[in-house]
């Protein structure tokens, strides 16, 4: 049905060949260009990506009467949202008294005071509405004995602004919450007139005078180029975990959205903040949900000690993810790891009733058996901190509008362009995301994009014309890759990049190692000129698509490591051995009376603004202030910074 919808639409649009000047592509012959058939489309809104954020945005747009296209490089229910396990946060108060303001406080604290408090206010206030909406769509939440939505404990979450003990705030569907959410949203979207372009790869944004007027994409099935002109474009492409060697991300998580903006001359933000999930299966990287610790599991070292009691005496194994990952790494570095090489940690669940494991954690029980050969009712799971989430991305405001920042003009909205989900930086996660806030981010900001677009767009009105020769650079790049006579395979260069990022920008970072990593990544970026795409065809050319994804990954990787090398402090997921302290505008570990507030240039409680020269790979940096004001002071006031402990 979905394929027929796009094919039916294709019959109504114009097709032509693209002509390029010789200067726009490498040594490709002019006759080669005629191979590229170009198809044009016109929509009120185009969504790139069909995970949770993309589907929620598309549903809202189509429900509001806008002609909406969804471009996705894989079938919607294979999007990486499907892999989220633990749950979605909302202060429903089903297990204990709760308040969205407590959720707001925990999220600000979890961000290590790098989160924008207006966006955090919006997300946490709207969380209950979002979960009830999902329930009304048919999402089969786990239930309590009295029929309410079951809520489990998750890391970094408290009652009464940190004074009331552990909160139970995470709504879940056993340990398959993302799977359920994705299928629920996709099923619900089919009742609206969304036009799906499945297995289409987004190549570039179409920009004219600073305005986004559409997207260029390639149909994987036959290699045709499609130009989507639209008044509104929503990026919902996920993260770039595959820039690292060990990660929980699917092979499709290649930072396509952040690369699209970088190529369009739009800045990204806070790319140095990469979350390492404490419990990826050792040797495999597969995720073991934080919900396993929320259900009563705990971490032990080689002495059988519950070591988190030393690092986080109150929260213990449910401290925030950055704290737990660093604590595990310290245990390993100091010789208290487990296994023959003492290079990992055990997650113990076998003290829990088998019935509880079967009911609440069936997915990870199966995963542990398949990937670690472990029966969780009898043995501990070998785990190690693993790259899991990117806090940085395309900067937006709480409405989802993409922002371009300059020191002279401050934040300026990029007309026609929105971002939601992991590819966006709203910034609700700041320097560290709380577990189960990611699924919330998806539905809250996917919906926010749709709301703002509907306020400013009437169906069929104002769809822009395409700039002359739109898409020439995209076709030139493809043609160059197909005909390049290099001697480096895509897989070889990708693996070198992944290992370099793992070695130079891991849980603990140091200036000299980061500096070396910057040099290595700079060389790897230039090595793209020597890539060899073995498959020269256009039909289902996976070699070509993986090379395009590698181009995207290298943009993300270089931005990440340069921003990390430049940030000389430790905050959230960014931990520097040589700069172990957080450097704020005031020293919040001491009485504030008598202190002088530092200027923005003299402290690090600020967002990094990152731009790339796509030709050379050179990265430039600016910084903008964190937003400390809430949307409405009468609803909740801001949370002032303080020393962060659990």
Swiss-Prot record:
Its EC number is 1.3.5.1. The keyword Ribosomal protein does not apply. One of its GO terms (biological process) is mitochondrial electron transport, succinate to ubiquinone. Its cofactor is FAD. GO terms for molecular function: electron transfer activity; flavin adenine dinucleotide binding; succinate dehydrogenase (quinone) activity; succinate dehydrogenase activity. Keywords: Electron transport, FAD, Flavoprotein, Membrane, Mitochondrion, Mitochondrion inner membrane, Oxidoreductase, Transit peptide, Transport, Tricarboxylic acid cycle. GO terms for cellular component: mitochondrial inner membrane; mitochondrion; respiratory chain complex II (succinate dehydrogenase). It holds the Pfam family Succ_DH_flav_C. It is a peripheral membrane protein. Substrate binds at residues 277, 289, 388, 433. FAD binds at residues 49-54, 72-87, 256, 422, 438-439. Residues 1-31 form a transit peptide. Pathway: Carbohydrate metabolism; tricarboxylic acid cycle; fumarate from succinate (eukaryal route): step 1/1. It comes from the Eukaryota. Its main location: mitochondrion. The modification Tele-8alpha-FAD histidine is found at residue 80. It is found in: Mitochondrion inner membrane. It catalyses: a quinone + succinate = fumarate + a quinol. PANTHER family: SUCCINATE DEHYDROGENASE 2 FLAVOPROTEIN SUBUNIT, SUCCINATE DEHYDROGENASE [UBIQUINONE] FLAVOPROTEIN SUBUNIT, MITOCHONDRIAL. NCBIfam families: sdhA_forward, sdhA_frdA_Gneg. Belongs to the FAD-dependent oxidoreductase 2 family. FRD/SDH subfamily. Component of complex II composed of four subunits: a flavoprotein (FP), an iron-sulfur protein (IP), and a cytochrome b composed of a large and a small subunit. Flavoprotein (FP) subunit of succinate dehydrogenase (SDH) that is involved in complex II of the mitochondrial electron transport chain and is responsible for transferring electrons from succinate to ubiquinone (coenzyme Q). This is Succinate dehydrogenase [ubiquinone] flavoprotein subunit, mitochondrial. It comes from Caenorhabditis elegans.
